[in-house]
């Protein structure tokens, strides 16, 4: 997975907790800065791909300190969700950027 444009689409996943997918890159940092308050309000959980070290993970977590952000396998998420790019928000009704 790489930073890039994600085509939004409607999904049907009742009960899914909102989650967002980011990487350790400037595009993801800006996206979080712009949407952080909304993500916190909806209690979204973050998954981060393409993070090289525990130190870099700590930096990424500092971008949105009041939100749970965990490392994840980009390959697995890409296959399961049909995504090639991030950052992206996934809710019970939509995948959107």
Q: Where are each of the predicted segments found?
A:
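Mid-length scaffold segments of soluble, non-membrane domains
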Residues: 1-59
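Short, surface-exposed patches at the edges or C-terminal ends of soluble domains, predominantly
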Residues: 5, 76, 94-97
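Short hydrophobic alpha-helical runs that function as membrane-insertion/retention elements
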Residues: 47-48, 69-71, 87-90
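Extracytoplasmic/secreted cell-surface and envelope-processing proteins
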Residues: 56-59, 79-81, 97
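Thioredoxin-like thiol-disulfide oxidoreductase module
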Residues: 62-64, 68-84
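A short, hydrophobic beta-strand/beta-hairpin element that forms part of a small beta-sheet core
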Residues: 82, 87-96
